[in-house]
């Protein structure tokens, strides 16, 4: 489950890896997004209190934040919170304000870093599930259906399956239980309901149901937190969504859920420990776990990556900065250009003059650029996550067939082989007669 939030860092217990890496990752986010061309806005957040007990929780969070080094924290009364966010409930008695919290496009955040790695020589082996791991004189042999990979060092960052991957080598010292979170994605007509991330007081199961703007002008609402046995269960439920809706209305009573355009769910990797698991196996030196990365995992990711580099250096691996580092090629965002810039781009490539996705003003040129990017998509959802085609109010009802045709043309495959998402999600069952 991912809310596209760059968390401030007041929630984790001081002294934990989670606390340190959350604050470090938050500080890194702005520079990374600016450098890689990722949509990001440091909008700030409010944690709401509706009773005296929750006011005490805010005080605890404030003290944690101070200990963790979170900048600019302030405790507000209810009137102060509503002065910032007029659509908050009159029942709000107090709030914790964290100006360093932000919102980001989570797919592009991850893709931009991955594409930069590919541009600089990293090879991705996608659709290659790990089936076995064995020790060798030189380190490890990782087996997949598409071949075997010899490595001196292995980093296990397999999300909710991290404990299962570790078990292919040896018994892991932890277990992971998936926790499902369900969401509403609201139309842009609701985007102005709040300008900051609105939290309720956190509990043991998570940071609670939030209401937040997105970098694309929508509103995201959710999630709940429900332990599920199936590590692939990302289905939504009537009961879960009803809970999210009821809880969110407590914070922002004016939300119009008739403007919902999409429901979805995701899974958090909840481990049997109360912290991120970032360590080398004692029994198998050279095998590292980066596991149990639940919230604030997205925020912490850049800092976790830096820690992985540090772990390798501690093993004596000589790592030098690449002298001819290649910057990521930024894709044009047609809707964000001025009229003069749009005209110049169309003169250069006429495909930018053909709008395919009307809801988000995404052009054929942008879709083609995504399909020929360093990590090209092969599905409608893959295109959507890279350039937003199909992300708007109609959710691909208008542009979906056109995007499908462009994918087939650019990849040189029959249109009936174009997928919606993962393997097997075919859109066309057979040719019409």
Mark where each language-model region is:
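Short cysteine clusters
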Residues: 357-359, 394, 399
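Conserved small/polar residues in nucleotide/adenosyl-binding loops
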Residues: 433
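Dinucleotide-binding Rossmann-like beta1-alpha1 core, especially the glycine-rich loop
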Residues: 4-84, 93, 208-209
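Helical element adjacent to the flavin cofactor pocket in flavoenzyme catalytic cores
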Residues: 96-153
């Amino acid at each position: 489950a991912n809310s596209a939030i760059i968390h401030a860092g007041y929630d984790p217990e001081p002294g934990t890896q989670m606390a340190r890496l959350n604050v470090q990752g938050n500080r890194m986010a702005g520079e990374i997004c600016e450098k890689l061309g990722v949509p990001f806005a440091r909008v700030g957040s409010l944690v709401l209190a509706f009773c005296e007990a929750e006011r005490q929780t805010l005080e605890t969070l404030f003290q944690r934040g101070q200990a963790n080094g979170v900048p600019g924290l302030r405790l507000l009364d209810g009137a102060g919170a509503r002065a910032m966010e007029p659509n908050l409930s009159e029942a709000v008695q107090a709030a914790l304000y964290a100006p360093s919290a932000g919102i980001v496009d989570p797919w592009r955040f991850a893709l931009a870093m991955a594409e930069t790695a590919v541009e600089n020589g990293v090879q991705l082996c996608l659709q290659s599930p790990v089936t076995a791991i064995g020790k060798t004189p030189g380190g490890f042999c990782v087996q997949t259906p598409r071949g075997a990979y010899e490595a001196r060092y292995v980093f296990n960052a397999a999300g909710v399956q991290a404990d299962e991957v570790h078990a292919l080598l040896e018994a892991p010292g932890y277990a992971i239980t998936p926790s499902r979170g369900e969401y509403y994605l609201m139309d842009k007509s609701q985007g102005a309901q709040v300008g900051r991330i609105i939290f309720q007081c956190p509990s043991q199961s998570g940071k609670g149901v939030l209401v937040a703007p997105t970098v694309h002008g929508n509103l995201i609402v959710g999630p709940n937190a429900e332990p599920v046995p199936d590590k692939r269960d990302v289905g939504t439920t009537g009961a879960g969504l009803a809970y999210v809706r009821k809880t969110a209305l407590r914070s922002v009573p004016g939300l119009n859920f008739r403007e919902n355009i999409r429901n979805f769910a995701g899974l958090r990797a909840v481990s049997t420990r109360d912290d991120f698991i970032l360590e080398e196996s004692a029994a198998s030196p050279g095998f590292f776990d980066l596991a149990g990365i639940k919230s604030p995992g997205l925020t912490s990711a850049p800092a976790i990556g830096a820690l992985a580099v540090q772990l390798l250096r501690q093993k004596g691996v000589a790592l030098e900065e690449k002298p001819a580092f290649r910057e990521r090629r930024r894709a044009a965002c047609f809707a964000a250009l001025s009229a003069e810039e749009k005209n110049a781009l169309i003169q250069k490539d006429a495909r930018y003059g053909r709008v395919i996705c009307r809801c988000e003003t995404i052009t054929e040129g942008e879709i083609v650029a995504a399909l020929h990017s360093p990590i090209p998509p092969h599905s409608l959802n893959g295109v959507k996550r890279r350039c937003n085609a199909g992300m708007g109010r109609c959710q691909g009802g208008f542009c979906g067939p056109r995007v499908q045709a462009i994918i087939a043309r650019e990849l040189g495959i029959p249109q009936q082989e174009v997928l919606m998402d993962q393997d097997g999600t075919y859109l066309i069952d057979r040719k019409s007669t």
